[in-house]
Regions:
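ATP-dependent adenylation/pyrophosphate-handling site
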Residues: 7-18, 22-58
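Divalent metal-coordination and catalytic microenvironments
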Residues: 19, 45, 67, 79, ...
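A general structural signal for well-ordered alpha-helical segments in protein cores
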Residues: 25, 64-67, 128-129
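Short beta-strand segments
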Residues: 42-43, 83, 148-151
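Glycine-rich phosphate-binding loop and adjoining beta1-alpha1-beta2 segment
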Residues: 47-79
Length: 179
């Protein structure tokens, strides 16, 4: 099936930062695109980091530009970037984040949502997961039938194992032949 032949599946990838979508499930996004699925990527935080030399408005614009370039390479036609403060989603009222996510869920009407694992070390990743879990809770006429959490390399594996929140994947997507 080519991208021109739509499969009817609608996929939302909702992440905290620019690049999380690629690190977490870039190959899976590409596979969905090639299967004819419509994929939306929603980025919540502005991408400014606390690392020296990587902050400020210029860095934010560069991260957004890089996110758009990555979306173009993957074939993603729908990209939304919000400007919640990076590494400070825990300072934002959770309800504000949930409302943004719920608005996207209403607009996209996805059957599947991909996001961060709840036990990730990064607070923004955990907060994003929490907001999505709330926004995608089962309700009558709710479109989301599957929510999948991914590992974010360089973040998830640094978390100390804590039983139920340890990342233990049970869903795998074979991307070995995905161009």
């Amino acid at each position: 099936m080519t991208p021109a032949q739509k499969s009817g599946r609608r996929i939302a990838v909702i992440v905290a930062h620019p690049d999380d979508e690629v690190l977490g499930c870039g190959g899976t996004i590409r596979r969905h695109i090639l299967a004819g699925d419509e994929v939306w990527v929603v980025i919540l935080a502005d991408g400014e980091t606390s690392r020296e030399g990587t902050s400020g408005d210029k860095a934010v614009v560069e991260r957004e530009t890089a996110a758009q370039a990555a979306a173009n390479i993957l074939g993603v036609q729908h990209l939304a970037v919000h400007r919640f403060a990076d590494n400070r989603l825990d300072a934002e009222p959770l309800l504000h984040i949930i409302r943004v996510v719920e608005q996207h869920i209403r607009e996209i009407s996805p059957d599947t949502v991909y996001t961060h694992h709840a036990g990730d070390l990064n607070i923004d990743h955990r907060r994003t997961h929490e907001a999505i879990l709330t926004a995608c809770r089962p309700q009558l006429s709710h479109p989301v039938t599957r929510m999948l959490a991914f590992e974010t390399p360089s973040s998830t594996e640094w978390q100390q194992p804590s039983g139920v929140l340890s990342f233990s994947p049970n869903w795998f997507v074979d991307i070995s032949s995905t161009p």
